[in-house]
């Protein structure tokens, strides 16, 4: 890769739903080449996007559609090509207009990779699919 080009990052191509319960969603994914940053580690934006997506799914699991209102993330350990990540999202506040979701990302060695908190703004009751 040359220094003057951005590396394309992909997030949603290879994840598996482990659990989808009211207020709690778990997915796994493998870090692939398109998940890496310029230095060969999982891109922070990739990790953040996984957490954001899970927060949306947790909101849906409570019966409501929601969008991200505020978020924060702490990156604790780098991930590399081939690592298996488990993304665990839990609703810690199930309010009428907002939901707060805590997300933990761990690797295959059960080491914490990132911890995030998302405040989700409720946009309406989920319509049955």
Predicted regions and their residues:
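Terminal targeting signals and extreme-terminal segments of soluble enzymes
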Residues: 1-129
């Amino acid at each position: 890769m040359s220094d003057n080009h951005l590396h394309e990052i992909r997030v949603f191509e290879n994840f598996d739903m482990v659990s989808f319960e009211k207020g709690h969603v778990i997915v796994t994914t493998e870090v692939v080449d398109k998940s890496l940053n310029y230095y060969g580690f999982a891109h922070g934006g990739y990790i953040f996007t996984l957490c954001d997506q899970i927060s949306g799914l947790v909101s849906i699991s409570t019966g409501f559609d929601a969008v991200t209102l505020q978020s924060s993330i702490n990156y604790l350990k780098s991930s590399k090509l081939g690592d298996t990540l488990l993304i665990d999202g839990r609703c810690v506040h199930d309010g009428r207009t907002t939901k707060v979701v805590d997300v933990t990302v761990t690797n295959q060695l059960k080491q914490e990779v990132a911890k995030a908190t998302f405040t989700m703004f409720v946009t309406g009751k989920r319509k049955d699919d």
